[in-house]
Amino acid sequence: MSATNFWSIYQHGFARVAACTGHTVIADPRANAETVLRHARRCDGDGVAVAVFPEMVLCGYSIEDLLLQDALLDEVEEALEDVVAGSAGLLPVLVVGAPLRHRNRVYNCAVIVHRGRVLGVVPKSYPPNYREFYERRQIGDGADERGGSIRLGGASVPFGVDLLFAAEDVPGLVLHAEICEDMWVPVPPSAEAALAGATVLVNLSGSPITVGRSEDRKLLCRSASSRCIAAYVYAAAGLGESTTDLSWDGQAMVYENGLLLAETERFPLGDSQAVADVDLDLLRQERQRMGTFDDNRRTHRARTGDFRTVAFELDPPAADLGLRRRLERFPFVPADPGRLAQDCYEAYNIQVAGLQQRLAAIGGPKVVIGVSGGLDSTHALIVAARAMDRAGRPRSDILAWTLPGFATSDHTKDNAHKLMRSLGVTAAELDITPTARLMLKEMDHPFAAGEPVYDVTFENVQAGLRTDYLFRLANQRGGIVLGTGDLSELALGWSTYGVGDQMSHYNVNSGVPKTLMQHLIRWVISSGQFDEETGRTLAAILDTEISPELVPGEEMQSTESKIGPYALHDFTLFHVLRFGFRPSKIAFLAWHAWHDADAGDWPPNFPEAKRVAYDLPEIRRWLEVFCRRFFAFAQFKRSAMPNGPKVSAGGSLSPRGDWRAPSDSNARAWLRDLARFDEPTA
């Protein structure tokens, strides 16, 4: 991959789509053709691959019996020829609504046009005939039209509901069209098309507006995109349609796998477009992982096996078009306050319920936990406290130790004691430094002779002793050791293996990424899970630098200065674990999410001082670190990880669950992909 096209969305598995609405002139196909071409030219300049227009946009949806007038139908065909001719030098595939004569009926059609030719024509399957709708008076039912052709512009073109349109030069871009009512039936044509391979489902809609119908449309579009693991592009008729008995709002929107990517203002006065970049890689990956999707295709192969595919070349631009979709800086932490609060409520209670069930299943032992005053052990402790509350047990059944070492600060130790005291757990302090000195002396470590050697052995002696003490204390007191290590540390292998923080009897934090941890604790404070004193202590802990506190010195020993920003590592982890994306694509996404601290939304209450930006060289640097540690180093630690609940839809790293990988693999394929492009400049 060269620096020239690294910035192109089409090099990273995206395709730009647009749902277009504008002013319709009823019964004036030539005027409407010019509106379509005006939109098409704008979409061409915007790098759009697929532009979708409303139902019967060339004449207006609301013209009733005028649909049976030859003069009008003649003009529709002539206007369509104008659109075809005008598209010759333009990029987008145009999906245009028009009434067309075929055999003995008039059909309500989606005409697929690209670069001066008609690729195919799809008739509406289910013209409605209830309430305000009376389409069957004029329009034929196209549901059984399969394998046919239609004469259009002097040529024979494919005609039927069994048509897919595939871009040969954009992997994964496979288009299917359905019309308005088609998506309201129990088994819509788009469902079969998705099983047959369509990834971009489009709906040309008339759909007069009534109170509440907008939300119904959104529900159906969201559901279709989620069930079909597809993009769903919807364009409804708007201004200019007849208001004899109805009104129109011109709603346009783009969904992808259940997520709203773009929508227009309703009741627009002029041209309006909902434009978004749909992620074809994401859709492909989700379908591959969800094996039942293809199982369902096989069940329905009698219907899905005979779809016809019309191939075309899009010839997408290699230029930098930006990225037209919202990206979360923190994929595990939504910026929307309501969604974040809901996620935190669910995550916390998943952890609490997981621990409560485990304790009940093994006879109700006490819980032994080491409390450092840092985020992870703090959160594990408040999970344990709530689990005891739910089980009707005293919090004194939690046996909490703070185990200070050579570099433990007074600040973190004081916070640990305050938290244990305010929660009412059984608290104690056990200083590990005498035992650590003895062990280092017996090992003939230079530190024992007074030399300031703070190597990995020095660090792991402390980490190992803490865990060793906790396990022996659990033996002595009839308890289990509660693990505190989080999902991000598991990904990077940032733990001491065996007799160290990698091991416990049960780990409530193993499914929680580091970037979510602080928000969980903030939610615990704001939702009043504990008293005010506990809340104040939790707030003080949130302000503490992330550090293992293993090396003596004047400055706080920051984990992130060594291993990299957890913000970037969690961004990478989400896209590797959930979607299997290439490192080069993750770099592209991370740059768009992180290069400008002032752009986009931050999670609520995120500290201003920590709202930083990252340039591409820094993103690549830490991506390489992640790839080396995740793929080539850390799996042996994950292969032996304790039980713990999955928390996020982003995935878990349990070898019994979401991530099953060999412990002796390597990172070469991922590092080669990351090296495919020279260092581009934005």
Regions found by a protein language model. Give the residues of each.
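ATP/NTP-dependent adenylation/nucleotidyl-transfer catalytic domains that generate, transfer
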Residues: 16, 32, 171, 228-230, ...
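Enzyme catalytic cores with a strong preference for nitrogen-chemistry domains
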Residues: 1-370, 386-395, 427
